[in-house]
Amino acid sequence: MSRELDVVVVGAGPTGCVMAALLLARNLAAPGRVAVVAERISSPSPRREVTAVPEAAAASAGIPWDLRVFALSRASQRLLELCGVWRSLPPDLVFPYERMCVWDESGTALGRGSLTFDCAELGEPDLGFIVDGQALQDRCVQAAGAAGAVLIEAAVQAVDVTERGVRIALADGRELGARLVIAADGAGSTTRELLGIATAGHTYHQDALVAHVRTAEPHRSTAWQRFLPTGPLALLPLSDGRSSIVWSTTREDSERLRALDPRGFAAAVLEASGGVLGDIELTTPVASFPIHLQYALDYVRPRAALVGDAAHAVHPLAGQGLNLGLLDCASLAEALGEAGAAASLGDYGPLRRYERRRKSENFIAAAALDGLERLFSSSNPGIARLRAAGLGAVGSLSFVKRGLAKRALGIDGDVPAFVKAQSP
């Protein structure tokens, strides 16, 4: 059985669902003519129960934050507003943070060898939002469906691109025809592979450990990040007073830490954080995922485009992965819209414009994150002194500091006008 569509988006994560909703919101395709295809599409779930560590069960009672959280920029917030996602997010699972403090192992938080960003200095209400991962996923699926996207649960088996269109064979025997296919199926994208697009990159030989902790001192609506020789530790503020940790460390250290009991792990976080928030109590299990740098050598083919992790996977140290992917969606929609209603959605010209814009922006971001990881993981004493001096210099140069903050907010850079936030 064959079904004819305008666009097929492969991947039903936040990036894929936002891509579909945005195409419909911008009137680039008609309701019922855009499909989101994935082997499994999550259905919105009732409020979750987080399995607490037994010794900390009482402390974890309350808002059931998902273990995975996202740090979203102002530009991402604006894009989610346009797609109808933002207003549907549960308020108690979205938390605005007002400050960010970054410091080197040899320095102190808010002191020597540290760098602090404050929303008040930028004239902004906040620096961004910490958002529950499952809540965001659920609402993005809802928004895509509400906008008129067809949700299809099936694995993609083959992609055949011709001058006239794209034929997509599904594992259940169905076939889809479209003018454009968009791969949003993650770093291990099957669609990218079927399109014959190669990737490059390297592994960091690191894992990212994630968990939620309760701290003796209030987080003060601040995202804290300390750079250690084995990788950075971030403490991200949650609405219930707890913090979500993202600890990037070597594979060997990751195995050691995951083998610790809750008290031992909490003690390790306390030491690694330099005691910035006082005593630590672990309130959830600890999960982990491997870290690598990967980028597609091409973002587009005739009648095909990559967005999100299918195009680029970066180090999580600055929490920019999803923000970059959402900007891909906005930029692709902008390029398709600039081509005019008469142009075919699969025309190569608009797709190449998208590639030129986002490839350079994403390369800058990936190179910067890779460079930071290498710089702060070096144990060379000379480089350590350079790091501390560099953080201090950036902190004293207000125009440099402001420029970095504005870029992270999505206020600066090659950002589509319809999502570009403007400072008050």
What are these regions (language model features)?
Residues 255-348:
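FAD/FMN-dependent oxidoreductases across multiple families
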Residues 10, 24-67:
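Glycine-rich FAD pyrophosphate-binding loop
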Residues 2-15:
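Beta1/beta-strand and adjacent pyrophosphate-binding region of the FAD-binding site
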Residues 62-107:
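N-terminal FAD cofactor-binding segment of flavoenzymes
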